[in-house]
């Protein structure tokens, strides 16, 4: 699978179109266009191609904001999935509430992790992960069960990762984020550390 790391709106769209069989990572660094807008353009492209099995995973506090912006700026319908709406869907007879017809599913990290099997079975075509730095500890395995559950549930799904702070404390955070997209890009943790620690040392010299 191809992996594109992009920094602006043009690169984002070009990469999204060129890597139809690949996976996409996005860090919205443009000073003029917000990450929600950039992601919205990718979502709109998928929607126009009738690829509508889409999920957005975001902090709980941002779910309504995502829903409003999708409707107001891109005319895209969405469905916020939480404990209450999940139960209501089940009562209506929907065996997997993550499967919504012509609606983008919006849910929280915690809820996606809790229902990771249902997320996987929904077979999403695209996932947008907002504030993706929350998954940067994925490389720690059992120490980050939420990150692992989400990454595993979306293992066959194309991903757009949105974050303004991909790196805070360690280069391993970059390793963790990229591994969410594809476990094989950097190899294992040891090879990553060997390759990039030597690069940092060489640069410093």
Positions of PLM-derived features:
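Pre-Walker A (Motif I) flank of P-loop NTPase domains
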Residues: 21-29, 52, 103, 157-158
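A short helix-turn-beta junction within AAA+ P-loop NTPase domains corresponding to the substrate/partner-engaging
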Residues: 174-187
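Walker A/P-loop
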Residues: 22-42
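Hydrophobic residues on the short alpha-helix immediately C-terminal to a glycine-rich phosphate/catalytic loop
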Residues: 42-46, 66, 177
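Conserved AAA+/SF3 P-loop NTPase catalytic/coupling segment centered on the Walker-B
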Residues: 129, 171-174
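SF2 helicase/translocase NTPase motor core
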Residues: 1-4, 13, 36, 47-146, ...
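Conserved pre-motif I regulatory segment
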Residues: 1-29
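Conserved helicase ATPase motor motifs in RecA-like P-loop NTPase domains
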Residues: 31-32, 157-170
């Amino acid at each position: 699978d191809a992996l594109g790391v992009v920094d602006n709106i043009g690169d984002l769209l070009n990469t999204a179109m060129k890597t139809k069989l690949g996976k996409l990572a996005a860090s919205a660094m443009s000073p003029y266009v917000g990450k929600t807008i950039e992601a919205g353009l990718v979502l709109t492209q998928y929607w126009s191609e009738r690829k509508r099995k889409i999920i957005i995973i975001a902090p709980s506090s941002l779910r309504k904001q995502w829903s409003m912006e999708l409707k107001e700026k891109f005319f895209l319908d969405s469905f916020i999935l939480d404990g209450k709406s999940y139960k209501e869907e089940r009562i209506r007879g929907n065996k997997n509430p993550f499967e919504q017809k012509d609606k983008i599913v919006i849910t929280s990290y915690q809820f996606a992790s809790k229902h990771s099997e249902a997320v996987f079975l929904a077979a999403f075509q695209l996932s947008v992960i907002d504030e993706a730095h929350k998954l940067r500890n994925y490389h720690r395995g059992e120490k980050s069960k939420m990150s692992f559950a989400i990454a595993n549930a979306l293992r066959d799904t194309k991903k757009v990762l949105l974050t303004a702070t991909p790196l805070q404390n360690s280069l391993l955070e970059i390793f963790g984020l990229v591994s969410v997209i594809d476990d094989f890009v950097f190899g294992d943790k040891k090879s990553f550390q060997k390759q990039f620690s030597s690069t940092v040392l060489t640069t410093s010299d």
